[in-house]
Amino acid sequence: GELKNKDIQEETHQVMHNLKNILQEAGMDFSDVVKTTIFITDMHQFGAVNEVYGKYFENRQSDRQPAFPARETVQVSALPKFVNVEISMIAVKL
């Protein structure tokens, strides 16, 4: 589908919502995520992206795992369809 030009926080919410749907299709949720990679086109937007990203892991902390999965954030010169953020996730169902 076509993407509407949104601000970075709206884009991040949309990406996380899409990832939530993919996880649910696999019988998982954000508590099963072990690693993420965030690609952004402007590192100055890191704080805005991080604020949204963190909300999706608010209920994750337990004795068996940290509050957030391992993560790196990388600035890239461009992303497909001129979006400003892309997130890759690895999830494991134990």
Cite the ranges covered by each PLM segment:
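Short, polar/acidic, helix-capping and beta-turn segments at strand->helix junctions
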Residues: G1-L94
